Each structure stands twice: as structure tokens, then as C-alpha cells.
Swiss-Prot record:
The gene is surE. Its EC number is 3.1.3.5, 3.1.3.6, 3.6.1.11. GO terms for cellular component: cytoplasm. The lineage of its organism: Bacteria, Pseudomonadati, Pseudomonadota, Gammaproteobacteria, Enterobacterales. Its main location: cytoplasm. This is 5'/3'-nucleotidase SurE. A divalent metal cation binds at residues 8-9, 39, 92.
Length: 253
């Protein structure tokens, strides 16, 4: 199994290094990751400047100023030969649950892998301690995929409780929960009196029902949420069509 491994926390982050070590016990792994923390980069792609890479002695590749999406794009199309069998992103330091997925560079890296035609996993730890637990869970899932491929055409967004492995209760297939909109902005002043702004914390949970990713992780279960790239709201087609007919927008051109 050939694995392209990326993340959004940066090439030296403990999550990706712990996972790379575990994966190399049974797979051919190429790390291509940002040279610094790019959390919250979502699906951004660098188009207005060139990208430089640096290869470390162990073969890991850092993309200077690159986003997670840049890293997977370069990894698949230029840096990993032969191409990978699967793209894995993580282990993220902190969860990617509910609405977090729309901002997450971790999920975006997996999404880019799927967009380019490869199976893809995004893996996050609900904390900053038990990376070995998340690595063990990921390795188990990948070994299962090697034995019996999962042909859904979907990204698997995996969130692991920050617990020792023997305290994990099991695994659940979940849906994304949701949060209240975030509204906090934290202003500060620099030494010259200029105002600086920090984005505040995420909103609180507003949908954390029993079938959500929030609930699974809170209860000690690994959450596996299938995600897809198509954002079309098919259920709204008729509503939007009827509205356009009723208001006559095209009659005003």
C-alpha cells in the first residue's frame, strides 16, 4: 500500500510524525506537508506565486508557504512516484467535528485527494495527548481497506477521543453535527497603537444528537463520518425553481 500523508499542522507536528511512524510498519509512506501550521486553510490553493519544497533526510517533504491542498496536489501530480493508492490527512491536533469541516485544512487535504481520484481519510484527535491511539485506529482502518476496499467514493472523516486505546469504546458511523455561529472577535493593540484582531473560539454545539460526530466522541467512540464533495442541495431544486418562476427574475432583464 502506497500512502500520501499530509496535514495542516505542519510537517514537524507530533500528529503527522506519530502516524507516519506507525504507517511505515506496513506501508510505503510519503509525507508531503506544509512547512508551518496552516490550520483553517480549508481548500485554498496557491495560484499567484510559485511553491518551493524542501526534502528532509528521512524523505519527508515540506512545501514552503504551502496549503494542505497544495501539498496533496503536488504530492499526487509531481512528488510521489508511483502515485499513491490512498491519501491520508492527519493526525490533527484537535477535533474536526460538525461545522469545523468547512474550515479544516485537515479535511481539505483529504478532499483534494478524493477530488483527484483517490480514496481519502482525514484523521483528528479530540485533544493533544494520545496520538498513538489515533494512529492505531487509523492503521486498523487502513489494513481493513487493504483487505476489502470501500467503494463509496466518499471521504472518511475520522475523529478519535483523546483517550488511551484500551478506553476507546468502539466505532460509530455518524453525521456531522452543527454549532451556533461564532461571533467573537478579540481586538488588541500593537506597540504602535494599531488595532489587531484575533478570531475567537468556535460557537457552541446546537445539534449534538445521538447520531452525530459530537456525541460519538463525547461518549468515547471513534466517529467515522462519510463526506462528499458535491455541495448541491438537491432537495431545494424545486423550491428555487418555483420561486424563480413566481418572481419573474428573467422578465426584468
Amino acid at each position: 500500500m502506497r500512502i500520501l500523508l499530509s496535514n495542516d499542522d505542519g510537517v514537524h507536528a507530533p500528529g503527522i510524525q506519530t502516524l507516519a511512524k506507525a504507517l511505515r510498519e506496513f506501508a510505503d509512506v510519503q509525507v508531503v506537508a506544509p512547512d508551518r501550521n496552516r490550520s483553517g486553510a480549508s481548500n485554498s490553493l496557491t495560484l499567484e506565486s510559485s511553491l518551493r519544497t524542501f526534502t528532509f533526510d528521512n524523505g519527508d517533504i515540506a512545501v514552503q508557504m504551502g496549503t494542505p491542498t497544495d501539498c496533496v496536489y503536488l504530492g499526487v501530480n509531481a512528488l510521489m512516484r508511483p502515485r499513491p493508492d490512498i491519501v491520508v490527512s492527519g493526525i490533527n491536533a484537535g477535533p474536526n467535528l460538525g461545522d469545523d469541516v468547512i474550515y479544516s485544512g485537515t479535511v481539505a487535504a483529504a478532499m483534494e485527494g478524493r477530488h483527484l481520484g483517490f480514496p481519502a481519510l482525514a484523521v483528528s484527535l479530540d485533544g493533544h495527548q494520545h496520538y498513538e491511539t489515533a494512529a492505531a485506529v487509523t492503521c486498523s482502518i487502513l489494513r481493513a481497506l487493504r483487505r476489502e476496499p470501500l467503494r463509496t467514493g466518499r471521504i472518511l472523516n475520522i475523529n478519535v477521543p483523546d483517550l488511551p486505546l484500551d478506553q476507546i469504546k468502539g466505532i460509530r458511523v455518524t453525521r456531522c453535527g452543527s454549532r451556533h455561529p461564532a461571533d467573537q472577535v478579540i481586538p488588541q493593540q500593537d506597540p504602535r497603537g494599531n488595532t489587531l484582531y484575533w478570531i475567537g473560539p468556535p460557537g457552541g454545539k446546537c445539534d449534538a444528537g445521538p447520531d452525530t460526530d459530537f456525541a460519538a466522541v463525547d461518549e468515547g467512540y471513534v466517529s467515522v463520518t462519510p463526506l462528499h464533495v458535491d455541495l448541491t442541495a438537491y432537495s431545494a431544486h424545486d423550491v428555487v425553481s418555483d420561486w424563480l418562476d413566481s418572481v419573474g427574475v428573467d422578465a426584468q432583464w
